[in-house]
Amino acid sequence: MVTIKELLPYSYWIGHPVSNRAIVYLFVGFTPLTLETLHTLNYIILLNTKRWAPRSPHSDPARMRIPTQPRKAPL
């Protein structure tokens, strides 16, 4: 079985926070969680929550850019 410490490097690979919740449920049921383990899980969830947080449309300069040349037709 994978330990929680082994999951930390894969926090971005895990993806959406819903996946993290599933992993948390896996470990809560089968292993006693220490304080260090809880901090590690909290850190993984925070990383992914920030990654998937909705962004403001004003923060993306590419959306506000006016195209100067027409797009080329696909070949």
UniProtKB/Swiss-Prot annotation:
It comes from the Viruses. The keyword rRNA-binding does not apply. Changing P32A: Decreased virus yield. One of its GO terms (cellular component) is host cell cytoplasmic vesicle membrane. It is found in: Host cytoplasmic vesicle membrane. Facilitates virus release from intestinal cells in vitro, possibly through the host autophagic pathway. It is a single-pass membrane protein. Keywords: Host cytoplasmic vesicle, Host membrane, Membrane, Transmembrane, Transmembrane helix. Residues 53-75 are annotated as: Disordered. Residues 13-18 are annotated as: Important for viral replication in intestinal cells. Changing G29A: Decreased virus yield. This is ORF2p protein. The chain crosses the membrane at residues 23-45.
